[in-house]
Regions:
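Acidic/aromatic-lined carbohydrate-recognition and catalytic surfaces
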Residues: 1-251, 256-257, 264, 268, ...
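An active-site-proximal structural segment forming one wall of the substrate-binding cleft
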Residues: 254-274, 363-367, 371-373
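Catalytic-core regions of glycoside hydrolase
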Residues: 343, 359-362
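Active-site-proximal substrate-binding groove within the catalytic cores of carbohydrate-active enzymes
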Residues: 366-390
Length: 390
């Protein structure tokens, strides 16, 4: 049974007509969410108060969800395997290269319909960092469209037209890091202690050097190391990717609450699938490579529980470029669901090897060694993406 106190905090902010269905969802998902979050943050003295505040926030986002999206939630919750249809066909593009703007993409919907597309992944279109921004993967604001590509109103129009055409829009949700000009980073630079605690900041090289002994490097040639000295912070900030991308401190429950809310606000704008970027890096632990830690899976399962409560029509897609044997963990299990979809990166790479060498040996070996998946989860088998073939 759900905790009455936390459930009541969510239900209290809902209109009367939305409460019965919300209460039904809470019966299943709230105990799961509480258990996962207690495992991550339960040792904090303020855990119960924090959890109550989180549930109230979720209730407000539930209430703000547009009626047409709530109807989609009901439809898909009644058919939880809707996305396992063998006719699901995806298309991936940069907005600027496919229509030039969100409005331009909307004008190309008839073309997508001709192709039989049911899933459109548009690479980052939220407001990015000024200057270098890793192709949009250094996000300044989760609540604003990149002005070069359109407006929030344009995004709403696009998602509405896509939904009418039976096409689900997928957006990247970069949850490992934000740009160094994101509002949280700016507040941290200005001396706000709560904002500073949202990042991994070290006063000297002692802890960074200890971590570096076991960490890999993502871009050793152009961005060596995993820590960047930031004068305004008076310390070293964890930057797994580029120096201007600050890793979020997911051991801080305020980060979980802020990122969950940001994701749900985007869901309420009509995003139906989230590509969760760099999921393997979410949790840091000294003495390891800080990848694939158990807590990273707890975080993803908690986000899944939140989606199941507020927006069950939404899918979560794991981007975890790890060995094939480690990938199923990001889909969870029937008893403990995590993401709905995961990239099968090894299959993609093996496909190109087969094409280049005119030999299917590697491809057949990858298929043979691909582990089974939970019943309500699937691979995203893809031909190419914006990253290298690996």
């Amino acid at each position: 049974m759900p905790s009455q106190v936390t459930s009541d905090r969510l239900l209290a902010v809902l209109p009367e007509d939305l409460r019965p269905l919300a209460a039904q969802r809470l019966t299943t998902a709230e105990p799961v969410l509480r258990r996962l979050l207690a495992g991550l943050y339960g040792e904090r003295a303020d855990f119960d108060a924090w959890l109550g505040d989180l549930m109230e926030s979720l209730g407000k986002l539930y209430a703000e969800r547009p009626p047409e999206l709530r109807a989609l939630d009901i439809q898909r919750a009644a058919q939880p395997a809707w996305f396992l249809n063998q006719r699901m066909l995806g298309y991936c593009a940069y907005v600027q290269n496919f229509g030039g703007s969100l409005n331009g993409v909307a004008d190309r919907i008839p073309y997508l319909e001709e192709l039989g597309i049911s899933y459109l992944h548009l690479l980052p279109f939220l407001r990015p960092r000024e200057g270098e921004n890793d192709g949009g993967f250094a996000v300044t604001s989760f609540d604003e469209v990149d002005p070069a590509l359109g407006t929030n109103a344009d995004l709403h129009e696009l998602t509405t037209r896509l939904r009418t055409a039976g096409i689900s829009l997928c957006s990247d949700f970069i949850l490992n890091h934000v740009a160094d000009d994101n509002q949280w980073a700016l507040a941290a630079k200005a001396g706000d202690p709560k904002a500073r605690a949202m990042f991994h900041v070290f006063p000297d090289r002692d802890m960074p050097d200890r971590h570096e002994r076991t960490l890999g490097q993502v871009f050793p040639q152009v961005a060596p190391g995993n820590f960047t000295y930031v004068e305004a912070m008076g310390g070293w900030v964890w930057t797994t990717f580029y120096p201007y991308q600050w890793d979020m401190n997911w051991s801080n429950p305020d980060v979980f609450a802020a990122m969950a809310a940001a994701m749900l606000r985007l869901a309420n704008r009509g995003i139906e699938v989230f590509r969760l970027d760099s999921t393997a890096f979410l949790w840091k632990r000294e003495g390891t490579n800080s990848m694939n830690q158990p807590e990273a899976h707890q975080l993803l399962q908690a986000l899944r529980a939140i989606v199941d409560i507020v927006a069950p029509g939404v899918l979560l897609k794991a981007e975890a470029i790890v060995p094939t044997r480690e990938l199923p963990a990001y889909l969870g299990s029937t008893a403990a669901p995590e993401c709905h979809i995961a990239y099968h990166s090894s299959l993609m790479a093996a496909g190109w090897v087969a094409l280049a060498e005119q030999n299917t040996g590697v491809l057949r070996e990858v298929i043979r060694n691909t582990p089974p998946l939970p019943s309500a989860a699937t691979w995203l088998s893809y031909l190419r993406c914006h990253d290298d073939i690996g």
